[in-house]
Amino acid sequence: MGMIGAFFDFDKTLLETESAKLGFQYLWERRLISFGFLLRILIANFFYQRHLLSDEFVGRIFLKFYRGKKLEEFTNGAPLFYRQYLKPRLAPNILCKVREHQKNGHVLILISGSVRYLLEPVIEDIGFDHLLCTDLEVGADGQLTGRANGPFCINKTKRTLASHLAQKHGIDLSRSYAYGNHQSDIPLLEMVGFPFAVEPTEPLRKVAFKRNWPILGFK
């Protein structure tokens, strides 16, 4: 009999808001981002929230910010950013679920389209066993290219990565749990025995009702 896993999405699931939004707010307050680029982000997010742009399209826009920069610029500040911006906005009810799974000895996996340097302080503080996420591409010159290194960890890619991890570590998906908020999380949610929709978008809410998936709130 395999181990039981618990897969948690991050943005608007374990975190009550979007980590990228907080990240760009942090950069804007420190004058590290131009008004023009911030405007592009706001416009893209406006259309994304209305389901008019895909996760990957918006993700590509976000990642262009990193082009020509050093990864160390961001990894060095990530722990402070987590403590000041992310940790105070963790969803109490979902964090409680994480603790329940920890208590029961389940394998904890944080799975998110967000970038690795933002999420590493999260898994270290909370105690996740594995992290599946989007990686930034580093060029031959040691600078970030503004692209992802591999696929974005979204949609069906989440399912693929989760499946590979489960096979590698002996996780029984039929006895495992998954938590997500967005219709793009459906491929992940439907692969486990116990899926949960967290403050779901309307498309995910409809699927959850149809399939009798429990719906959870942040608090």
Which stretches of residues belong to each language-model region?
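Metal-dependent phosphoesterase signature
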Residues: 57-93
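Active-site phosphate/ATP/adenylate-binding loop shared across adenylate-forming ligases
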Residues: 49, 65-69, 136
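C-terminal cap/substrate-recognition subdomain and adjoining C-terminal extension
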Residues: 2-3, 76, 83-219
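Active-site neighborhood of HAD-like aspartate-dependent phosphohydrolases
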Residues: 1-50
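A general structural signal for well-ordered alpha-helical segments in protein cores
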Residues: 20-21, 59, 159
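N-terminal alpha-helical segment
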Residues: 38-40, 55-58
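Conserved alpha/beta cores of soluble small-molecule-handling proteins
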Residues: 4, 32, 49, 53, ...
